Every structure is written in structure tokens, then in C-alpha cells.
Amino acid sequence: MVYLLAIIALLITFILVPVLIPTLKRMKFGQSIREEGPQSHMKKTGTPTMGGLTFLISIIITSILAIIFIDNSNPIILLLFVTIGFGLIGFIDDYIIVVKKNNQGLTSKQKFLAQIAIAVIFFILSQVFNLTDFSTGIHIPFINFEIPLSIAYVIFIVFWQVGFSNAVNLTDGLDGLATGLSIIGFVMYAIMAYFQGATSIGLFCIIMIFALLGFLPFNLNPAKVFMGDTGSLALGGIFATISIMLNQELSLLFIGFVFVAETLSVMIQVTSFKLTGKRIFKMSPLHHHFELVGWNETKVVTVFWTVGLITGLIGLWIGVS
């Protein structure tokens, strides 16, 4: 069953992308590029965005099949809820930017409130309706200790889901970067879930891996399509949720290390400029800094993937120790 669902996830995405690209072009759903960004990016203007729809559709269809045919599908129901919720926020944001020609998209407040709502509903579904049995404390690796939070854990869920959904969104600025890092991350969590005996979560990770593998060939440099906020916000929300459901929250700091580094680079840049009027990096997020240093896009992506693989293995080691 696992192999069949993996193949279905791969094929749905791989078939949908070539169908969607001309449709997006015809509807002029193209990406706008920041003028102050690297000049090499200007050629990307008009590249179809919202491509994340393809792998989200694949994930939804394949997950529904899994829910129908496997036992103990409650974790998949929860993960599917988060996928659809964060994906919908991203879709609305993309729609406003691309169709309504409003580069701001949803306001930060609107996004934050929507993300809070999803996090709270996730907590209620998991704890009140007992759809899964993860603890409401933060697990500390190696010392077999947990910081109990009880009902306050919902605050952590909000912070974790919102933080990582936006972290993946910030990272999705180079062809194939966020897609490749996400594949690496879900491989690590699939293995971790296997060691924990969390078969449903492991199956969902495998579905994610193969759905993204179907998208990757079209997203590599030169990208024929971008995932947009539709894809990136969903991926970040899923990563946070899986780490929570496996009670391995802190492992995500390593498995998602590049996402964290990209986010910190933006925070450091903004803080430094406000306090001193000086910038630490040539440009943020971090991948743009390396481009302006002289690295070509493919080199940046390859190096970041390599870093993601190394830190991902460290995160896996932490998660299974």
C-alpha cells in the first residue's frame, strides 16, 4: 500500500504540473520580481506561480486514499487539516497578489490571525477529540525530560506553526531551494517516524516526498513554475506539525536548519538597520547575500541542500537517540 500511494502521489503531481503551467501563463498568474533584488532574477519575471497547488492536490487525494484504506488514520486527518489550512492561506495570498495585482497580498495581521485559528483548531482536534496522543510538553533530547505546558502548549503550537510556515516561505526564493530542502526534511521525519512506530505519520511523510519529487523537475533552475505561498506556507506548517506529533519539536531546528538560518538573517538584517543604520548582509534572506557575493544560483542551492542534508542527519540522530 505504501508503494502504491507513493507512486500515485508522484504521478499526480508530475501530470498536473505540465497541465497547470500553460493555464497559469494564459491567466497571467506570473511572479513579480523585486527590483532591488539580484539582477539575474529579473528574467524570472512572469514565471507562473501558485504551482504548489499541484503537489497539494496530490497530497490531498493520496491522503484521502490512505485514510480510507489504512488503520489508525487519525494522524493523517490532522496533517491533512493543517495542509489544507495553511495551503488555503497561501492560495488566498497568491490570488490577491497575482490576480488582484496587489503586491502586498494578505496583510501580516490577516495571515497571523488565520494561522492562529488553524493552530488552535489543530490543538482542539488533537486534544479534545483525541485524534492523536502527542504530549503537551516540549521534549528535551538525550536527557529524557519534558517541559510540561498543558493548555499553554497551544501557544507553542501557534509559535511553531506560524514560525516555520513563514520560514519556508522566506527560503523559497531560488529555483528548487525550498522544494529540495523539504524533500530532505521529510525523508528524515519518515525515518524518525519509522523508529518511533508512528506508521501513519511516516506514510504521510512518504506521500510528501513523492508529491514533491513530481514537482522538483519543473522547479529546478531555470524554473518553469514556482510553488508560491500556496506551497511554501503549507510545507512549513506541515513540518512544524510533524515535529509536534512525534514529540520531537527541537529536532526541527536541525532538520529545518536552513529555514531557520534564512529567517534569522532577515531578523538580524532588519534589527541591525533599525538600530545602527547598517546592514549585516548584502541582502536578506541569506540566499540573496551569497548571490550578491558572486555565487551563481545553482551553487547557492547545491550548497544549501548539502548543509540541509548534514544538519538533517544531525536532527534525525537527535530524534532517534
Swiss-Prot record:
It catalyses: UDP-N-acetyl-alpha-D-muramoyl-L-alanyl-gamma-D-glutamyl-L-lysyl-D-alanyl-D-alanine + di-trans,octa-cis-undecaprenyl phosphate = Mur2Ac(oyl-L-Ala-gamma-D-Glu-L-Lys-D-Ala-D-Ala)-di-trans,octa-cis-undecaprenyl diphosphate + UMP. Its EC number is 2.7.8.13. Pfam families: Glycos_transf_4. Coiled coil: none annotated. It comes from the Bacteria. The chain crosses the membrane at residues 1-21, 50-70, 76-96, 112-132, 140-160, 173-193, 198-218, 225-245, 250-270, 300-320. Its cofactor is Mg(2+). Keywords: Cell cycle, Cell division, Cell membrane, Cell shape, Cell wall biogenesis/degradation, Magnesium, Membrane, Metal-binding, Peptidoglycan synthesis, Transferase, Transmembrane, Transmembrane helix. Pathway: Cell wall biogenesis; peptidoglycan biosynthesis. Catalyzes the initial step of the lipid cycle reactions in the biosynthesis of the cell wall peptidoglycan: transfers peptidoglycan precursor phospho-MurNAc-pentapeptide from UDP-MurNAc-pentapeptide onto the lipid carrier undecaprenyl phosphate, yielding undecaprenyl-pyrophosphoryl-MurNAc-pentapeptide, known as lipid I. Belongs to the glycosyltransferase 4 family. MraY subfamily. This is Phospho-N-acetylmuramoyl-pentapeptide-transferase. It comes from Staphylococcus saprophyticus subsp. saprophyticus (strain ATCC 15305 / DSM 20229 / NCIMB 8711 / NCTC 7292 / S-41). The gene is mraY.
